[in-house]
C-alpha cells in the first residue's frame, strides 16, 4: 500500500497482547515503515487497546483506528489499509460493557446490541471520491463454530472471508486456507471472467466430493471406492497441495524460499489437474 500506491496503513489492536504489539512496532521500525526521526514519512499508524485495559477502552480502539483511517482518506486524500486484530475482541469488549450496564444478554450471552455495534464500525469502512479504506480483519471463531453470533455478524459485512483449517495445518499444508468455507463476492463471471469462474467452481466441486468420501475412506479404505471416485480423491489431494504456497515472511520459520505465482499460471495449473493431464504425477 505504502510503496506501490502511496497510501498508508492503520493497525487497530483490539485486546492485543502487549508483547505482540511491541513486536509489531519494533518490526515496523526495522523495516523503515515507521520513521521516528521524521514521523511525516511514516506509512503506518498503530493503535492499541491492550488485554489488561478496561472493556470501554478496548471497545473504542477499533473505532479510533477507523477515525484515523477516515482522516487519511478525507483530509490527506490517501488510500488506506485498515487492519483490525481481533474483531472478536471488539464484540467481547462490547459484551462486557453491556453486562456492566445491566442489559439482558441475548443469544449465547452476547449483548442485545451486537448487530448495531458491529454496524457502527463496519458501515464506516467505505470509499469516497477522495480515497478508499480497505479493511482486513482477523476474526477469532469460538470453538470453530462459524454460526456463532460474533463471527456470523462480522462475516455479514465482509466482501470476502478466508477461513483457516486446523485439518490442513495438521497435514503441513500452508497457508491452511479452507476453500470450501472461504467465500468471496468478487468470484462472479462478469468480474473475474468465465475461465477463472468455471475453474474455481470445478475445484470446489472436486474438493466437496472428496470431503463427502472421507468418511467412507476412513471406514472401508480407498480400495472400496469406484474408479471414478478414486480419481476424484487423487485430483483433490493434488489440488490441496497445489493451493499451498511458500511465504516470503515465513522463510525464517520454514526454510523454504518464498514464491510469487501469476494468477494466469495458477488457473492453468488447476485446469490441468481437473482435466486429468497430471494424473500420472504423484501427489507431492
Swiss-Prot record:
UniProt-annotated location(s): Plastid, Chloroplast thylakoid membrane
Catalytic activity, as annotated: ATP + H2O + 4 H(+)(in) = ADP + phosphate + 5 H(+)(out)
EC number: 7.1.2.2
Main location: plastid
A single GO molecular function term of this UniProt record: proton-transporting ATP synthase activity, rotational mechanism
Membrane topology, as annotated: Peripheral membrane protein
Keywords: ATP synthesis, ATP-binding, CF(1), Chloroplast, Hydrogen ion transport, Ion transport, Membrane, Nucleotide-binding, Plastid, Thylakoid, Translocase, Transport
InterPro entries: ATP-synt_VA_C (IPR055190), ATP_synth_F1_bsu (IPR005722), ATPase_a/bsu_AS (IPR020003), ATPase_alpha/beta_chains (IPR050053), ATPase_F1/V1/A1_a/bsu_nucl-bd (IPR000194), ATPase_F1/V1_b/a_C (IPR024034), P-loop_NTPase (IPR027417)
Signal peptide feature range: none
Domain of life: Eukaryota
Any one GO biological process: proton motive force-driven mitochondrial ATP synthesis
Keyword Thylakoid listed: yes
Gene Ontology cellular component list: chloroplast thylakoid membrane; mitochondrion; proton-transporting ATP synthase complex
NCBIfam families reported in the protein's UniProt record: atpD
Function: Produces ATP from ADP in the presence of a proton gradient across the membrane. The catalytic sites are hosted primarily by the beta subunits.
Subunit structure: F-type ATPases have 2 components, CF(1) - the catalytic core - and CF(0) - the membrane proton channel. CF(1) has five subunits: alpha(3), beta(3), gamma(1), delta(1), epsilon(1). CF(0) has four main subunits: a(1), b(1), b'(1) and c(9-12).
Family classification: Belongs to the ATPase alpha/beta chains family.
Record's protein name: ATP synthase subunit beta, chloroplastic
Source organism per UniProt: Asplenium nidus
